[in-house]
């Protein structure tokens, strides 16, 4: 019996406190009210920590129970709840008869709070001998004037009827008559809840009698009504037509909780288009009006689940514009989920309206500065990108909006715009002229070398005809005066360069106009100095100094030492010159353009070697520029083909590979969707390992199963299947030990549950058999398991919870301590290793996101490849399987045998941590028996994640070597 007493809390007590039972009795007997309160608190703590003081019960009955103090009354309710009420043979203690009489007096007390709290306490009693004499007093409380007493009396009768129905055989009739005469909503809710579980027929009769007034009830009663309707209709589908109108009415309830539950119930009862639309509209309204972001995300998940249902998706497509109203929420996660949902639902009839809304959202981001504004712009760019590829008709309207992002200071959004432009210009030849035109206009306003580099590549690859000269002109404008070294020398000497003359000429007209309008003091502004006096400062004297250091963007990149943009610019100019030569028949014009282009390249080389830039040009960039110069001077057919044909073909192949990968993932997703066919066999829960439920599942059963399973990603079969449990059993002791122990390790999302089986293999009774555990790593034991008594050859199960807070490898170790008639013995347990793989799930991200995370994460772990594998592809498969990561590099990019392989891998933990890995391996092509060599670089935000993943890779390599 003692092992089954519930332990509600554990309160730490200082070790220095010495507990004396005689002192406790003296304080309880002779102390004043405050002393009795403090002593009673100490007794409660000691009882909760496992101490036993049977001699105190009579003292408390004689000297504490009669005290009419509310604090003492509250503490006594806790004391009587936790104190052992039975003797060693399981019989009720004689002293409890006196306590029972005290309960009866409290139930008749004029103070309604004391009555109500006593009734709540009676719900926790498990001794029918104590409850039986109190039944008349409990029944009398149903007629009390105060609702607090009445509603707790209903709960007490409900609990007693559920546990000991023979104590109140007429419970349902009693509560049904109480419900008919009751006006208080909390009392009606508790009474209706009892009828729901004890006598559904009476609950249905009551609901049918007042079904037209349901919308006037309080939210607590409406929630119980929704639960009743769901259970009844799920058990008896013929009742749907009787109560579905009530659910429709509850969709308009003033309580958001009732509306949420009603919408979820409605779509499980009916798949009619009107029902789906009403439920989805209700969900959308909840997301829009609810301020809590967690609630928004939960309701959005429900909408996503509805969308996954094939029959519901078509109905929800007309609600895309309503879904986009959620974008008014400032939270980036809510916006991300909303845009993903809208993208899945949009179709040809409403894509135009959706693009208009997204364009308005783009305009809003220009005037709002928020920490997530840059991420939101990036989301909008990607959404418009997907819309344009999915529906090419809107691409022409989207391109002008997106090109504006190129001048944005947020490099991520601008990079995504260029990714979109690159794909659109390849897939939609009709839009190339429009895209090039807008790109040329935006080119001088770009502020990032990375964006300029990508824009230069697109212009060089796809510009045609007369636009070639326009592109070269805008490049020259953005590059500045050529030769650049001479221009920088003049700038250093204080002479005016060509661009300074142009800037001064354009500014001179403005200055003359302003001077004509104002007086002599019109070009000066007053400034306040530190001592409070005014100082005059001329705008004309300051402006030239500021403008003296201002250079064109491309020139500034080169002066900062970024000559990679110079190499990319040289390749683009080479392509333009070669294409112009194909179009222009006159040799003189060809040569003029070629020499102009070669002058720019040689000027970049000269500048890189001159010492003016902060960093000199690298050998790699020098070689690239020399290749371009040599190609223009020699004009070999092979080199011309590389510049004019192969680059575009490579892009086309890459986009095709991405499209094939997306289609493959879409097919896998469709295959994973469970579809019930007419001839599918009926599955019995006891005989099956579990199965993905349909949307029309019993949500109460599934929520209970999910709560038991713990892990969000664990299927029911992973928890319920005996086979899966056997795979996770760890033997803790040997078969020859006096105590045999084995543990089933159940890894949940935030904790680990150890279900330990302990078997007494001796002929002796083991007293105080205690499982003592300790942890190593980022693990924490939640509570110490209670000691048990094991009879000869008896066994028991002990559960221990271990809290997990991060993705790291951990070790659980300990021993079993037990007492026999002669001495105390200890059995040391085998260690339990907690695998990091239980917390890592494969995930995917874009190349841009991968590079950004790789740049941001500071912890890196480099693992050297040491394996017996001789095939690069086999080693990659082994690595993905052992680390549970996803390979982001397309399969086509990895195909073939060239003796070298590089791949990116990505995974996420259930705690939201990201793990990146880059594989770089090689082997000689001419030696098929040679082993794979190379290294794996792991990056993560936390050190523990990087080290744990590296340890996992190293251990998997050792296992493969030993197996070989």
UniProtKB/Swiss-Prot annotation:
Primary localization class, coarse: cytoplasm
Residues in HEAT repeats: 129-166, 238-275, 314-351, 393-430, 466-506
Biased composition (Basic and acidic residues): 490-501
Tissue: During oogenesis and spermatogenesis, expressed in ovariole, germarium, testis tip and testis.
Keyword annotations from UniProtKB, A to Z: Cytoplasm, Cytoplasmic vesicle, ER-Golgi transport, Golgi apparatus, Membrane, Protein transport, Repeat, Transport
One of the protein's GO biological processes: intra-Golgi vesicle-mediated transport
Subcellular location: Cytoplasm; Golgi apparatus membrane; Cytoplasmic vesicle, COPI-coated vesicle membrane
UniProt membrane topology term: Peripheral membrane protein
Annotated stretches, region: Disordered: 490-530
Low complexity bias (residue ranges): 512-526
Cross-referenced InterPro entries: ARM-like, ARM-type_fold, Clathrin/coatomer_adapt-like_N, Coatomer_bsu_C, COPB1, COPB1_appendage_platform_dom
GO molecular function, one term: structural molecule activity
Pfam assignment, any one: Coatomer_b_Cpla
Domain of life: Eukaryota
GO CC annotations on file: COPI vesicle coat; Golgi apparatus; Golgi membrane
UniProt subunit comment: Oligomeric complex that consists of at least the alpha, beta, beta', gamma, delta, epsilon and zeta subunits.
Comment field (misc): Brefeldin A induces dissociation from the Golgi of betaCOP and presumably the other coatomer subunits.
Function, as annotated: The coatomer is a cytosolic protein complex that binds to dilysine motifs and reversibly associates with Golgi non-clathrin-coated vesicles, which further mediate biosynthetic protein transport from the ER, via the Golgi up to the trans Golgi network. Coatomer complex is required for budding from Golgi membranes, and is essential for the retrograde Golgi-to-ER transport of dilysine-tagged proteins. Required for limiting lipid storage in lipid droplets.
Protein name as catalogued: Coatomer subunit beta
């Amino acid at each position: 019996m003692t092992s089954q007493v519930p332990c509600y809390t554990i309160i730490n007590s200082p070790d220095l406190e010495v507990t004396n039972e005689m002192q406790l009795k003296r304080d309880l007997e002779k102390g004043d009210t405050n002393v009795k309160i403090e002593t009673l608190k100490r007794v409660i703590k000691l009882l909760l920590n496992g101490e036993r003081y049977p001699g105190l019960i009579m003292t408390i009955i004689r000297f504490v129970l009669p005290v009419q103090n509310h604090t003492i009354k509250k503490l006594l309710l806790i004391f009587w709840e936790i104190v052992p009420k039975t003797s060693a043979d399981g019989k009720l203690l004689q002293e409890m008869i006196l306590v029972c009489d005290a309960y009866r007096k409290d139930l008749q007390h004029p103070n309604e709070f004391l009555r109500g709290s006593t009734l709540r306490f009676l719900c926790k009693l498990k001794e029918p001998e104590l409850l039986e004499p109190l039944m008349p007093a409990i029944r009398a409380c149903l007629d009390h004037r105060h609702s607090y007493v009445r509603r707790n009396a209903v709960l007490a009768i409900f609990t007693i009827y559920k546990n000991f129905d023979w104590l109140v055989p007429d419970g349902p009739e009693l509560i049904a008559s109480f419900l008919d005469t009751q006006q208080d909503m909390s009392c009606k809710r508790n009474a209706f809840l009892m009828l729901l579980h004890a006598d559904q027929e009476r609950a249905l009769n009551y609901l049918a009698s007042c079904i037209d007034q349901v919308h006037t009830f309080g939210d607590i009663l409406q929630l119980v009504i929704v639960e009743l309707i769901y259970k009844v209709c799920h058990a008896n589908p013929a009742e749907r037509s009787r109560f579905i109108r009530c659910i429709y009415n509850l969709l308009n309830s003033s309580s958001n909780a009732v509306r949420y539950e009603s919408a979820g119930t409605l779509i499980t009862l009916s798949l009619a288009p009107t029902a789906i639309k009403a439920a989805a509209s209700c969900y959308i309204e909840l997301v829009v009006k609810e301020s809590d972001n967690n609630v928004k995300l939960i309701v959005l998940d429900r909408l996503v689940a509805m969308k996954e249902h094939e029959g519901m998706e078509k109905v929800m497509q007309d609600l895309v514009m309503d879904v986009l109203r959620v974008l008014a929420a400032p939270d980036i996660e809510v916006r991300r989920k909303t845009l993903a949902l809208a993208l899945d639902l949009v179709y040809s009839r409403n894509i135009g309206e959706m693009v208009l809304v997204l364009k308005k959202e783009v305009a809003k981001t220009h005037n709002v500065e928020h920490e997530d504004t840059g991420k939101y712009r990036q989301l909008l760019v990607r959404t418009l990108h997907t819309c344009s590829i999915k529906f090419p008709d809107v691409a022409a309207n989207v391109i002008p909006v997106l090109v504006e992002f190129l001048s944005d200071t947020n490099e991520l959004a601008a990079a995504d715009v260029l990714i979109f432009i690159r794909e659109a210009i390849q897939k939609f030849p009709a839009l190339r002229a429009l895209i090039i035109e807008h790109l040329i206009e935006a080119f001088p306003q770009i502020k990032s070398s990375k964006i300029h580099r990508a824009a230069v590549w697109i212009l060089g690859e796809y510009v045609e005809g007369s636009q070639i000269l326009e592109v070269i002109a805008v490049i020259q404008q953005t590059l500045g005066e050529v030769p650049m070294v001479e221009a920088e020398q003049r700038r250093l000497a204080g002479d005016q360069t060509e661009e300074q003359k142009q800037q001064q000429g354009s500014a001179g007209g403005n200055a003359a106009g302003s001077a004509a309008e104002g007086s002599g003091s019109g070009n000066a502004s007053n400034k306040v100095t530190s001592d409070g006096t005014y100082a005059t400062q001329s705008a004309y004297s300051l402006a030239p100094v500021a403008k003296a250091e201002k250079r064109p963007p491309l020139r500034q990149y080169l002066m900062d030492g970024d000559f990679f943009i110079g190499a990319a610019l040289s390749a683009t100019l080479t392509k333009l010159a070669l294409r112009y030569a194909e179009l222009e028949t006159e040799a003189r014009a060809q040569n003029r353009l070629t020499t102009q282009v070669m002058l720019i390249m040689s000027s970049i080389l000269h500048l890189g070697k001159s010492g003016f830039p902060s960093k000199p040009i690298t050998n790699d960039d020098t070689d690239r520029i020399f290749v371009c110069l040599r190609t223009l001077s020699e004009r070999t057919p092979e080199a011309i083909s590389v510049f004019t044909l192969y680059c575009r073909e490579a892009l086309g192949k890459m986009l095709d590979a991405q499209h094939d990968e997306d289609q493959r993932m879409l097919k896998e997703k469709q295959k994973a969707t469970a579809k019930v066919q007419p001839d599918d066999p009926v599955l019995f829960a006891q005989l099956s390992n579990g199965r993905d439920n349909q949307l029309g599942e019993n949500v109460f059963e599934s929520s209970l199963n999910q709560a038991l399973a713990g892990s969000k990603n664990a299927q029911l079969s992973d928890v319920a299947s005996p086979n899966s449990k056997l795979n996770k059993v760890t033997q803790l002791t040997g078969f020859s030990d006096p105590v045999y122990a084995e543990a089933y390790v159940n890894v949940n999302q935030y904790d680990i549950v150890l279900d330990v089986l302990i078997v007494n293999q001796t002929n002796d009774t083991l007293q105080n058999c205690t499982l003592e555990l300790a942890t190593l790593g980022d693990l924490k034991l939640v509570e110490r398991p209670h000691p048990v008594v094991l009879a000869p050859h008896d066994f028991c199960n002990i559960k221990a919870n271990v809290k997990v807070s991060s993705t790291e490898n951990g070790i659980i170790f300990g021993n079993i301590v037990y007492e026999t008639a002669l001495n105390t013995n200890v059995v040391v347990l085998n260690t339990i290793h907690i695998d990091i793989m239980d917390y890592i799930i494969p995930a995917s991200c874009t190349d841009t996101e991968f590079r950004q995370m790789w740049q941001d994460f500071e912890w890196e772990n480099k693992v050297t490849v040491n394996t017996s594998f001789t095939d690069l592809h086999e080693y990659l498969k082994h690595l993905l399987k052992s680390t549970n990561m996803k390979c982001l590099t397309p399969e086509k990019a990895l195909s073939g045998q060239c003796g070298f392989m590089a791949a990116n891998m990505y995974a996420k933990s259930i705690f939201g941590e990201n793990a990146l890995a880059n594989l770089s391996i090689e082997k000689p092509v001419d030696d098929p028996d040679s082993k794979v060599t190379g290294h794996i670089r792991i990056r993560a935000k936390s050190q523990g994640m990087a080290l744990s993943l590296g340890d996992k890779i190293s251990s998997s390599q050792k296992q493969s070597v030993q197996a070989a």
